Amino acid sequence: LKKGFIFDLDGTIYLDNQLIKGSAETIDFLQNRGHHVVFFTNKSIATRTDYVKKLNHLGIRTSLEDIINSNYVTARFLKQKMNPSELAYVIGEKALYDELEKEGILITEDANLANYIVLGWDRQFTYEKLKQAYMAWRNNHALIIATNPDRTCPTAEGPVPDCGALIGAFEGVSGIKIDHIMGKPSRFATDLIVNHILKLKPEQCYIVGDRLETDIHMGNVYGLHTILVLTGISTQQTIKTTGIQPEYILESVKEIMQMSEITDCKAERRGALHD
């Protein structure tokens, strides 16, 4: 029975430019058995093409169709939601701009003209950018969309601030929750990947990642099998703290090759999914 595997990248497949031991072998193992493997990252500072090149360089076979990042999800969402004449003001890096432009999203540098504000990870984030976004929201009732909810991103030197920092800044000044957060664990992202890319039923899909509040939460809410790996952000202690329970907990992705549920033709459940 064909299965779909949705792998996170940072903290799951690699850390920075260092492949996590057993990752390439695990992906090969699954691909050679006819399973559909895709990669889904919330990181918004690199393009999908960048990820194809990086994974290929690290010895993992993949192509553009099997790479999803939060920029791509955001662009697809906006393409469905925006009228052709509407404009977006973007706080983010070049990779986010590129993805939005590929989907035909019109971008303005003048926040006063914006119908939508897009927040992404921005390592040149300034008070002025925050002020412009706030003014567009206050004066134009612009909708606020964030690429992803992650507070931090794992790196070899430890976690660093991610898009969640920008969300916090905007919510701090506006006093409201922003309108939409894309990437994991959004319903839109899940539908896009499961129904339109993998084209499988949720129960045929496994999401593999190192974050409880994004990877595992997404799987639990939308009926996917969940595999938490302990090579990134989350720990056994985090599970107790958050109350988010993965279906499987593995030291790293290489242990997937020993799971009878994966290697056997018939999948047997080893625990209940938690809603």
Where are these regions (language model features)?
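A metal-dependent hydrolase metal-coordination microenvironment
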Residues: 42
